[in-house]
């Protein structure tokens, strides 16, 4: 070790790309191709449409309902906006940092409008390409939304009372 330290954002991969460039490319893809500037990430790939005939759009490949407008992907999208805002602020680009913070706030509002089910007091799984609101009581999605800061205190309390069984949701096949 020679004592030289390289900033991670200046690190170059085997393709010759700096980390900063790779992050910008990934964010640009989410903002443009996946329509993130609308406040909701939308997967327009016909294979990932959130229907029973579609393919899952994420790690949870057994759940074909993830796709098109997925709560799971949108949680990560929200977190990526906050992370980009932090990076931009750290490197002194306050204009970009504020842009990402404003978009994160827009995304938080859109997330709650689209994925929060008032009648059940929890977040749904997704909205498929046919406009169907799919809810399979995904506890991990609800926990992740709370952890990410998307849920209000009241929403988090509803979620945890459902999960611990003190609040029962009619029609659920599993309780507490």
Report the location of each language-model feature.
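Alpha-helical scaffold segments in soluble metabolic enzymes
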Residues: 29, 83-86, 158, 162
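Aromatic (Trp/Tyr) and acidic
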Residues: 67, 134-165
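Short linear functional motifs in flexible/disordered or boundary regions
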Residues: 35, 89, 116, 157-158
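Well-ordered alpha-helical scaffold segments within catalytic/enzyme domains
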Residues: 1-14, 76-94, 141-155
């Amino acid at each position: 070790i020679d004592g030289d330290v390289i900033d991670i954002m200046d690190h170059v991969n085997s393709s010759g790309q700096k980390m900063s460039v790779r992050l910008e490319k990934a964010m640009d893809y989410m903002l443009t191709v996946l329509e993130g500037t609308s406040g909701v990430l939308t997967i327009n790939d016909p294979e990932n449409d959130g229907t029973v005939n579609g393919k899952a759009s994420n790690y949870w490949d057994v759940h074909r309902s993830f796709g098109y407008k997925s709560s799971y992907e949108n949680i990560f999208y929200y977190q990526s906006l906050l992370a980009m805002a932090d990076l931009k602020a750290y490197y002194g680009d306050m204009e970009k940092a504020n842009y990402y913070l404003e978009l994160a706030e827009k995304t938080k509002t859109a997330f709650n409008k689209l994925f929060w089910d008032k009648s059940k007091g929890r977040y749904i799984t997704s909205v498929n390409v046919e406009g169907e609101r799919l809810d399979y009581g995904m506890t991990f999605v609800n926990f992740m939304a709370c952890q990410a800061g998307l849920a209000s205190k009241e929403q988090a309390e509803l979620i945890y009372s459902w999960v611990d069984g003190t609040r029962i949701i009619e029609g659920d096949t599993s309780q507490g």
